[in-house]
Curated annotation (Swiss-Prot):
Its main location: nucleus. One of its GO terms (cellular component) is nucleus. Coiled coil: none annotated. The gene is hb. This is Protein hunchback. The lineage of its organism: Eukaryota, Metazoa, Ecdysozoa, Arthropoda, Hexapoda. It comes from Scaptomyza albovittata (Fruit fly). It is found in: Nucleus.
Length: 171
């Protein structure tokens, strides 16, 4: 798109590019038509600038439209528009779990609600784990379980390697 915009700008408003490409545009305009080279210089600001700005805006507008169309097509292809932008991992984890039971003819309607609630649950779990006062019930249990399961193999390993030091730590 840049080359086409560049060519359009040179054709419709050669004055702005005279500064950048003074030699090239100067020679080409004189060889092609002297009127084109002389008229923009006489009225540089009023005539060439409006087409340049309109061209730029049209180009940007077209690009934005194309981007929006692509963005609109993506959520239609992926039935979960909520998950891809912010939380790709939960989508990958939740998608198979939800798609297996949701074998109804309308999975796209069933999955967004479940995934949004699951994402909210994931976010709330993360927040609670980060804060840990509301979840005081579960972290101690999990920590105790992990410590116990962690200590049992360590005891065996410690008795094998150097029992005196490690038994002091375990006691």
């Amino acid at each position: 798109w840049y080359s086409s915009m560049f060519a359009a700008n040179i054709k419709e408003e050669p004055m702005s590019h005279h500064h950048h490409h003074s030699h090239h545009s100067h020679g080409h305009h004189h060889s092609n038509s002297n009127s084109n080279a002389s008229s923009p210089r006489q009225s540089p600001l009023p005539s060439p600038n409006p087409p340049s700005s309109s061209n730029l805006h049209l180009e940007q507008y077209l690009k934005q439209q194309q981007q929006h169309q692509q963005q609109q097509q993506q959520p239609m292809d992926t039935p979960l528009p909520l998950t891809p932008p912010g939380l790709p991992n939960p989508m990958q984890i939740i998608m198979p779990a939800n798609m297996r039971p949701a074998t109804q003819p309308t999975p796209t309607i069933a999955t967004p609600t479940t995934t949004s609630s699951a994402i909210v649950a994931l976010q709330s779990n993360d927040k609670l784990q980060a804060l840990t006062p509301p979840m005081d019930v579960t972290p101690p249990k999990s920590a105790a379980k992990s410590q116990q399961s962690w200590a049992e193999p360590e005891k065996d390993h410690d008795l094998m390697s150097n029992s005196s030091e490690d038994m002091k730590y375990m006691a």
